[in-house]
Amino acid sequence: MEHRSKMEFFQKLGYSQEDVVRVLGKLGDSALVNDVLQELIQTGSRPRAQEDPASGTGVVLIPRGCCGVQDSAQQGPGTRPRRGWRRSSPLLRPIVIDGSNVAMSHGNKEAFSCRGIRLAVDWFTDRGHTYIKVFVPSWRKEPSRSDTPIREQHVLEELERQAVLVYTPSRKVNGKRVVCYDDRYIVKVAYEKDGIIVSNDNYRDLQNENPEWKWFIEQRLLMFSFVNDRFMPPDDPLGRRGPTLSNFLSKKPRPPEPSWQHCPYGKKCTYGVKCRFYHPERPHHGQLSVADELRAKTRAWLGGGAEEPRTPSARSRPTTARLLPQEPGEHDLPPAPQPAVLAALNRSFARLTFSDTAASGVVSQSRGPDWMPTGVPTSWAPPSLRAGSAATIGLPGMRSLRTPNNPLSPGDLGSPICPQARLSERHRSRDMHSDLPPQRRPLEDPWALLPSSYCYLNHSVWSESAWGEDIFRGPSESAQPVANGGGTRPVHCSFFPPDQDHPVMASGPPLSDMALLTLLQRSQKTGAPLGDP
């Protein structure tokens, strides 16, 4: 850099030509710029703007920190502090300043320093607050005394002319000063304006006086500190977990800015919405936890192309839901039979006769009247099978004759095998289904769920053609199809092996009453129902 260019450069920085020539003569024209600046600083040279602030050519640099304004000692008598560098905003809360507390805090509790009030007012004015009120007792306008020193009292006059300062009333009575309670003015005006109280006083007496004021003072009190001539309110007026100073002074606080620090776990993070770090892979959708994401994916998968589930209780309905929860006991009992089926059963069993001495093998030929009219009775009590035992069996037990798996119809009951033979076959097939649960055993035989007292029917009853209008056939009529191996062979072959089925089919007449009684007694000794599979 040439000598001339260096001279112009340092003169633009504000140094005088004499100082620059002196330093360059000492260090030489080939000296570096940093070395020249260091020498100028060490020799005490300063720019002209700082040496002569009152000159018209100098530029006064005003700091933009919290102080915001030059001290009153550095300002000229006619100069006003620079305010309003931020545009006024109606969203800022009104400010009510406790003038006595602020002035005494700035005077270090020794003097009433009016400069502290000016610094506080200028700080809020620079932030853009338009409503600022300072309350000071009126006796502070009196001349300063040794017991009550007042500094820079002219500041109060300036603030009063600007309609910022308000004097609270006070007077003298019999030579004694009567002062009104200025704190009540401060709290009342701030409460009505929904503003901020600037003071280091807690106003405990006023908190106990009014519960509404208690909450307001706790939430709207702004404390402060003075660092030399710098007014410094805290950045967190209500504590570390409270709002920031900007939100505290605003009517509509802004939400906190999100943290842009990337999560150290990246895509492997399992905190979900609770993670306080930034995830760039989740910019356009809400952050969900892992469990919520799995639930959402499961719902979408079931609702999109899932097949309609089916319930395991209905074999005849393949489209019933399987995965849907079932109510307890919903499929434990079979559905009630239709009224027409009950009426047909009542007509069919109206001619049954029972033996009171069936255990001895003597069968009674007597026949009772039609004691079960059509559609009327729903429960009945059969005769006692043994001495001292009487069982009441209800007709609703017959509902098991019609189930979703085996509906009762005349075609199903029209089997060429007599009921005694079918009962014998059911007893022989008990071992085949003993390992199945009770509710899952096959119900292909409607005689399987009949009470055991049906086994003691008179032999002549089965031979009557009026029984069920040929629905059930007697032993004499069923012997012919059995011997011929008619329509019963497919039924037997489906449940019994051929080596057991052929001898039974070729034995001629069906089982006698004595054989049937022996089978029934054996079933009763084991304790299992006769028709239980």
Swiss-Prot record:
It is found in: Cytoplasm; Cytoplasm, P-body. This is Probable ribonuclease ZC3H12D. The lineage of its organism: Eukaryota, Metazoa, Chordata, Craniata, Vertebrata. InterPro entries: Rege-1_UBA-like, RNase_Zc3h12_NYN, ZC3H12/N4BP1_RNase_Reg, Znf_CCCH. One of its GO terms (molecular function) is zinc ion binding. A zinc finger (C3H1-type) spans 251-282. Expressed at low levels in bone marrow derived macrophages. Disulfide bonds: none annotated. Pfam families: RNase_Zc3h12a, UBA_6. Gene3D superfamilies: 3.40.50.11980. One of its GO terms (cellular component) is P-body. It comes from Mus musculus. Belongs to the ZC3H12 family. Residues 302-335 are annotated as: Disordered. Its EC number is 3.1.-.-. Its cofactor is Mg(2+).
